A protein has these predicted regions:
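Alpha-helical, coiled-coil/dimerization segments enriched in small aliphatic residues
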Residues: 258-287
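Extracytoplasmic ligand-binding site segments that recognize negatively charged/polar headgroups
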Residues: 175-178, 190-207, 242-267, 311-314
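Proline-aspartate-enriched helix->loop->beta-strand connector
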Residues: 155-169, 187, 291-305
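Short helix-initiation/N-cap motifs at beta->coil->alpha
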Residues: 147-155, 195, 282-290
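Structured C-terminal subdomain patch of bacterial secreted/periplasmic proteins
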Residues: 200, 204-212, 302-368
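Extracytoplasmic/secreted envelope proteins and their assembly/folding machinery
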Residues: 101-105, 116-120, 126, 156, ...
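A short, structured surface patch at a secondary-structure boundary
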Residues: 84, 105-162, 166-171, 277
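Bacterial Sec-exported substrate-binding components of ABC uptake systems
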Residues: 2-115, 216-246, 364-368
């Protein structure tokens, strides 16, 4: 797989191509590279399967109804390392290519979710960030120069002007030739693995920490994040009502995809105490195009979306007009939860706070 695409965002790109080439095509497959592959099973339900498996829309008093939002006001990630003392140089080879990092005085992180910058901040090195990507939207980074003004693309000149000592990326921002140019210019470019779910946050913390010379401190930080996440999980599951949920990735009226297990959506829903409505669709990748048949078969009680994604289709009313949505309990009851784009599937140090905010929105705030 090209280094310019992570598994999750590679799956999105492949699904978008399918949608563009064949509108409404059932069973579009993702790139044939394993984990980034989107299963076509989500769109394979025939009319008989749909008729036999569709759940009647919940209409009782206990049915989740209405539009709710996760309350996540912008805030800096919690700093988990009080006195970071990087031990350098270090040599890392997360993607199979050895890279030596000799200095972390000037750090640049590049990823679509902003998870790398948040982890660097949590490790106590936020003051060493010299630029930011679009998703790095927390207050402490607001004054940093943005190197992705067009969204998710970079150019070598703007980065070279920042004189970074090291660039951390997961490959979700490119093009890859720009990263190659930076390497040719003598800048260490470290590609952090992109396999991130709520269950891999400790590994993610260790990978970033090791790269910046904070290996042991990073392990402790990762353990602290996991402890907070497990506590948020227990709280959410205590209040859960067992509803069926589905995470959708939406961009305008022409892009609608189901988030599968490798996007981290399944684990997130389980931690919320819900049932992943997409489980019965046979998905084994990160994302796959949404079809009316798959939506009706899944029969979610609540749909979870990114805030800007919901806005891009006209809000809850636009969501309700998606083909097949009205035939689901979520559509019949207009049950939707929106979460800030940079938080929903980023899976980093903020995930415990995100999970807690989602649980509060879904089930009501816990009694003090």
């Amino acid at each position: 797989m090209p280094t310019s695409l992570t598994r999750r965002h590679g799956a999105i790109a492949a699904a978008l191509l399918c949608l563009v080439l064949v509108a409404g095509l059932v069973g579009c497959a993702g790139p044939g590279t394993g984990a980034g592959e989107g299963s076509g099973a989500a769109g394979a339900a025939n009319s008989g399967d749909t008729a036999n498996s569709t759940n009647a829309a919940a209409t009782g008093d206990s049915a989740p109804t209405g539009h709710v939002s996760a309350e996540l006001p912008p805030t800096d990630p919690e700093v988990l390392v009080d006195d970071p003392q990087p031990k350098l140089p270090v040599t890392v080879d997360w993607d199979g290519a050895e890279v030596e990092v000799a200095s972390v005085d000037r750090i640049l992180t590049l990823d679509r979710a902003g998870a790398l910058s948040r982890m660097v901040w949590a490790l106590g090195l936020g003051d060493r960030l010299v630029g930011r990507d679009t998703a790095t939207d927390f207050p402490g980074a607001a004054d940093l120069p943005q190197v992705t003004p067009g969204g998710h693309t970079i150019n070598a000149e703007s980065i070279l002007k920042l004189r970074p000592d090291v660039v951390l990326t997961d490959g979700s921002i490119g093009p890859s030739r720009v990263l190659d140019t930076l390497t040719d210019a003598g800048i260490p470019v470290v590609r952090i693995p992109d396999e991130r779910t709520p269950d891999t946050i400790a590994d993610f913390a260790t990978q970033v920490a090791t790269t910046v010379g904070l290996g042991e401190q990073g392990e402790k930080a990762g353990a602290a994040i996991v402890g907070k996440l497990d506590a948020a999980t227990r709280d959410a599951q205590t209040r859960a009502d067992g509803r069926r949920m589905m995470v959708l990735y939406l961009r305008g009226t022409t892009v609608a995809m189901i988030a599968g297990p490798e996007s981290g959506a399944s684990s997130l829903i389980e931690r919320l105490g819900g049932v992943d409505a997409a489980e019965g669709l046979g998905m084994d990748g990160a994302f796959t195009p949404l079809t009316p048949e798959a939506l009706v078969k899944a029969a979610p009680d609540t749909v979870i979306v990114m805030t800007h994604g919901l806005d891009s289709i006209g809000g809850p009313a636009g969501l309700g007009s998606l083909p097949g949505m009205a035939q689901t309990p979520a559509g019949a009851n207009a049950s939707v939860l929106d979460v800030p784009d940079s938080q929903l599937l980023s899976f980093g140090p903020d995930t415990p706070r995100v999970l807690a905010a989602m649980a509060d929105a879904l089930y009501g705030k816990a009694a003090a």
